[in-house]
Curated annotation (Swiss-Prot):
Keywords: Aminoacyl-tRNA synthetase, ATP-binding, Cytoplasm, Ligase, Nucleotide-binding, Protein biosynthesis. One of its GO terms (biological process) is arginyl-tRNA aminoacylation. Belongs to the class-I aminoacyl-tRNA synthetase family. A motif ('HIGH' region) lies at residues 137-147. This is Arginine--tRNA ligase. The keyword Transferase does not apply. It comes from Desulforudis audaxviator (strain MP104C). It is found in: Cytoplasm. Transmembrane segments: none annotated. GO terms for cellular component: cytoplasm.
Length: 563
């Protein structure tokens, strides 16, 4: 699917390549000198035009000239037929700026009308299979703010990639094996006996959250004291299965209420049951990347970019978590994913080079794995930090957050900053119904537009109020043109956000778009604007509503008709 603005950019790129070829003698470039990768971007400063390129700066070394000289030579060789380019100038150290004929804006609104809910889609992925794994919280407690941010990020990344043509699978890795699960069983055992009236302390390194008290109470209601005597392993196994089923069901329900639905819930234990961990260790051994020391089995991680070698099997014969994680990633590749994306917390930063090294050791392409590292969340209420502590049960859960601020505010606030930035979440702001609350501000723009069309129907007319393409050349006001220009940016914003795995770009874009609409709405009438102009403005606000809704959908936020 090609868009007007993207077509103009592509045309300018082709023209620049043609200019380099034509100017080779003047630039002193022989035929073997490749044209370096360059950009044609929308400049930040409005007075710099509609597009700018850095091509001249990149040719400085091979051409042995100043970038400004190169830029002037390139401009003299530019051929821009039928590209609606009004002016080309050289600015600063050697940027080439392009100003388009203002009439190009006339094609934007009909384009949005044509594509509707599909406006912004691209086929950049070509159907390539992508797996996005996110949250993957231990089933040992409730979902906290870090999990919530990961859920919002991961789901929006998946939505963006799907929107631009990738075949996306959302996956949750269930940590139902290993030490933390053993701790859960022992913690449940303590809560079970406490529910039966016995004095049985929770292990010091166990899980002290009050949620396990409730889980144990429900277990007693169902099974009574049946497991109080007898084989401890049988008792712990029954308690563990009950807790895991309940915890996973609760997680699934919470995430679904947050607007997140997974295609696959993948069990860590299944890697052992199917022998995948053993197969992975055997393959690493066969390829010569394992060795024994002090009774343990080690991976030569240092040979693959790691800062030290890693234990994969302890001296007691039990595989480490890293061993299972390598097997899990091997399984991802073996399932045919072309691109694997993980959303991990900041505490996993050092795990990235180790995992990439392990994949390389197995013979897989480590560059097919991308990891989005997510920084911490701080909650604020009344200007004070709301403290969180998972092990003591005093942290704020995702369920509590949803009850307090609602899904839309939570989803939007969690993607307002890049994953690599710390996030301060102001609970009071998220609940407010003022323009300072960005979610309210954006949704109010959509509701305002919907109100216009309700008024139209109340006057006996059928929405959207025009039966053919209105005369969009009547939209001459600066507020109108600024709004159309920003609407035209949406496909490129989506493509860049998908490429960067950066949903915050869409959060910023849709807030900016809402601001431009409010400015237009406060300055100009729509209904009753006069013959021809009313229809053109109805088309403008209808297209704005389409793009607001498309952008909010990518973020998992609703677009209300009324507020």
């Amino acid at each position: 699917m090609s868009y007007l603005l993207a077509g103009l950019r592509a045309g300018i790129e082709r023209a620049l390549r043609g200019a380099v070829e034509a100017a080779r003698p003047d630039l002193g470039l022989d035929s073997g000198t490749a044209i370096p990768p360059f950009t044609v971007e929308v400049p930040r400063e409005k007075n710099h035009g509609d597009f700018a390129t850095n091509l001249a700066l990149l040719l400085t070394k091979p051409a042995r000239r100043s970038p400004r000289q190169i830029a002037e030579i390139l401009v003299s060789h530019l051929s821009l037929p039928e590209l609606l380019v009004k002016e080309v100038t050289v600015a600063g150290p050697g940027f080439i700026n392009f100003r388009l004929d203002p009439n190009w804006l006339h094609g934007v609104l009909p384009e949005i009308e044509t594509w509707g809910e599909h406006y912004g889609r691209r086929n950049l992925g070509g159907g390539r299979k992508v797996q996005v794994e996110f949250v993957s919280a231990n089933p040992t407690g409730l979902l906290h703010m870090g999990n919530a941010r990961g859920a919002a990020l991961g789901d929006s990344i998946a939505a963006l990639l799907s929107f631009v043509g990738f075949d996306v699978t959302r996956e949750f890795y269930v940590n139902d094996a290993g030490h933390q699960v053993e701790n859960l069983a022992l913690s449940m055992e303590a809560r079970y006996f406490q529910a039966l009236g016995r004095d049985w302390p929770v292990p010091e390194d166990g899980y002290h959250g009050e949620d396990l008290i409730d889980t144990a109470g429900r277990f007693v209601a169902e099974h009574g004291d049946r497991f109080a005597s007898g084989d401890p392993d049988e008792r712990r196994g029954a308690l563990l299965r009950f807790a895991l089923e309940e915890k996973l069901a609760a997680m699934r329900a919470t995430l679904e209420s947050f607007g997140v639905r997974y295609d696959v819930w993948f069990s860590e234990q299944s890697l052992y049951d199917r022998g995948v961990v053993g197969e992975t260790l055997e393959l690493l051994k066969k390829r010569g990347h394992l060795y024994e020391r002090d009774g343990a089995l080690w991976f030569k991680a240092g040979a693959f970019g790691g800062d030290k070698d890693e234990v994969l099997v302890r001296r007691n014969g039990v595989p480490t978590y890293f061993a299972a994680d390598i097997a899990y990633h091997k399984d991802k590749y073996d399932r045919g994913f072309d691109w694997v994306i993980n959303v991990w917390g900041a505490d996993h930063h050092g795990h990235v080079p180790r995992m990439k090294g392990a994949l390389a050791a197995l013979g897989y392409d480590p560059d097919a794995l991308d990891v989005v590292i997510m920084q911490l969340v701080r909650l604020y209420r009344g200007g004070e930090i709301v403290r969180m502590s998972k092990r003591t049960g005093r942290y704020v859960t995702l369920d509590e957050l949803l009850e307090e601020v609602g899904r839309d505010a939570a989803r939007y606030f969690f993607v307002t900053r890049g994953a690599d930035s710390h996030l301060d979440f102001d609970l009071d702001l998220a609940k407010s119904r003022t323009n300072e609350n960005p979610v309210y501000y954006i949704q109010y723009a959509h509701a305002r537009i919907s109100s216009i069309f309700r008024q139209l129907e109340e006057r006996g007319r059928t929405a959207p109020g025009y039966r053919k393409i209105p005369d969009v050349t009547l939209l001459k006001e600066e507020a109108e043109r600024a709004l159309i220009r920003r609407l035209a940016d949406f496909p490129d914003e989506v493509a860049q956000a998908a490429y960067d795995l950066a949903p915050h770009r869409i959060a910023h874009y849709v807030h900016d778009l809402a601001g431009l609409f409010h400015h237009f709405y406060n300055a100009h009438r729509v209904l009753g604007a006069g013959d021809g102009l009313e229809e053109a403005r109805l088309m403008l606000v209808n297209c704005t509503r389409v793009v607001l809704r498309n952008a909010l959908t990518l973020l998992g936020v609703s677009a209300p008709e009324r507020m």
